[in-house]
Amino acid sequence: VMNMWPGVKLRVTEGWDEDGNHFEDSLHYEGRAVDITTSDRDRNKYGMLARLAVEAGF
């Protein structure tokens, strides 16, 4: 993220769900999922953010 968008940070908004905010079969209940965004919350970056996550092995 820092190489793609200088000054923008990765934000983890949720990793483990205890409150039941996700679908019943969500991997959040097993601690195997994460919700992420960027510090500037620019939705136009989300497609590239997903590609970067896949390239990093997530």
Swiss-Prot record:
One GO CC term on file: plasma membrane
Pfam families reported for this sequence: HH_signal
Location relative to the cell: Cell membrane; Secreted, Extracellular space
A molecular-function term among this protein's GO annotations: calcium ion binding
Annotated positions binding Ca(2+) 1: T13, E14
Main location: membrane
Binding site for Ca(2+) 2: E14, D17, D19
Binding site for Zn(2+): H28, D35
Post-translational modification: The C-terminal domain displays an autoproteolysis activity and a cholesterol transferase activity. Both activities result in the cleavage of the full-length protein and covalent attachment of a cholesterol moiety to the C-terminal of the newly generated N-terminal fragment (N-product). This covalent modification appears to play an essential role in restricting the spatial distribution of the protein activity to the cell surface. The N-product is the active species in both local and long-range signaling, whereas the C-product has no signaling activity.
GO biological process, one term: regulation of gene expression
InterPro entries: Hedgehog (IPR001657), Hedgehog_sig/DD-Pept_Zn-bd_sf (IPR009045), Hedgehog_Signaling (IPR050387), Hedgehog_signalling_dom (IPR000320)
Keyword annotations from UniProtKB, A to Z: Autocatalytic cleavage, Calcium, Cell membrane, Developmental protein, Hydrolase, Membrane, Metal-binding, Protease, Secreted, Zinc
Top-level division of the source organism's lineage: Eukaryota
UniProt keyword Transmembrane, yes or no: no
Domain remarks: The desert hedgehog protein N-product binds calcium and zinc ions; this stabilizes the protein fold and is essential for protein-protein interactions mediated by this domain.
Similarity field: Belongs to the hedgehog family.
Function, as annotated: Intercellular signal essential for a variety of patterning events during development.
Record protein name field: Desert hedgehog protein
Organism: Danio kerri
Higher taxonomy: Eukaryota, Metazoa, Chordata, Craniata, Vertebrata
Gene symbol of the encoding locus: dhh
